[in-house]
Amino acid sequence: MKRIIIQFGGTGDLALKKLYPAYQHLMEKEFTFEVLSLGRRYTTREDFLANSVDSSAPTSFTDHLDYLYYDMADTNAVNLLSAKLKEMVGTETEVELIYYLALQPSLYEDAIHQIKQIDASLDCVCTLIKKIVVEKPFGFDLESAQRYNEILEKAFTDKEIFRVDHYLGKEFMQNLLLMRFHNDIIRRIWDNRTIESIQIIFDETHGVDQRLGFYEKIGVVRDTIQNHIMQIITYLTMSEPASLSPEDIAMEKEKVLRSISSIKEFHMGRYESLGVNSGHVVQTPTYAAFKLFVNTYYFADIPIYVRTGKMQKEAKSLIYIKFKNTTKQVMHDQEITENAVIITIHPELTIDISMNLKMPNTSWKSKPVRFRFNQSETFGVNTPEAYEQIVQKILIGDKSLFPTMKEITESWRIVEPMLAEDQDVEVYPIRTLPRFASQLAKENHFTWFD
């Protein structure tokens, strides 16, 4: 079968930094497909390869990577792409076309309209399979997401639509389900009888000024909270699915999201130097902190504290699950530290379980000790990157790592109050935790796990 990935946004950051390396690695694993990259930055394939692909890339990859100058605003663009695809398809009797939209959401509508025109003009005397891949954020808000989905479903069936949140391709997300449901020692304590609180921390050291034109329209809510954070919460709190099939997992995730009320108590800020060279005042939030509850039977009353944003002192992504201290102090009234599970996503994937053990040469004095799993130490450095797993699933037609439209819709509903344009946005100095994040901890009598 002839399989072609038509890469919209083929000269953008996502394609250059994530998708092309993923394509190369999959080709090295003997997955067979062609890539047609579309872009406006270069006029020829030679210029594209010289400026976009590492010179050390093997010919086993570059021989299967083509390029077409493509301006979506050009009325002749569709004809050019149709002609190119006809040339690539040739006389093949089985063809799969994968349209990968690495574009801003505002361009989805035009892209889908053009894809429909291309499909109609192909005249392929063959068995044709179609897929379309759309990146997060899917839409700008609930209304636009629903509108884009209506447009998508006029051209593709739900089976053919792959909505990407690359965090679902990360090993830690899949490990989270395995850890919870394949280990009785964890499974039996993972509910509101024993868990006191959960923290989710996503701090980044870099800013957004180099891609301000894009980020100014997106902000921290659309960039991280509506997608990555909501998906993590579903994996942390979903009930055990009947199986690990995409349908059964999605059913339990949707139940979690439906139980969460819209976030009405939150704080947002922007770092002080944001847009300083842009010539205008930029009020786009780059940091947010809030509390929410999952109102299901097993997780009701467990507060989930979230903070996420840019220009922090240290880059870290982690989940901190704190357990209730129900231990009676029988050991000479020594203070007992709460048990915890700490899942670190960045800078490296580790899972720590914190327990209290006796210190040597003491009279029953205890000390918290961590038992650690380290992904790279245990399984080596061959763990696939998230996008490699995502693309592989697309190629084989497995939708287990892709959020459903119901999940996306519920996630937009939850964060919708945070998208209002009249928000108070506090300015915070770079490399410092915003005051409102510290205040959230103070008001709720907890300490951020730093």
What do these predicted ranges mean?
Residues 1-134, 138-450:
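Secretory/organelle targeting and membrane-embedding segments
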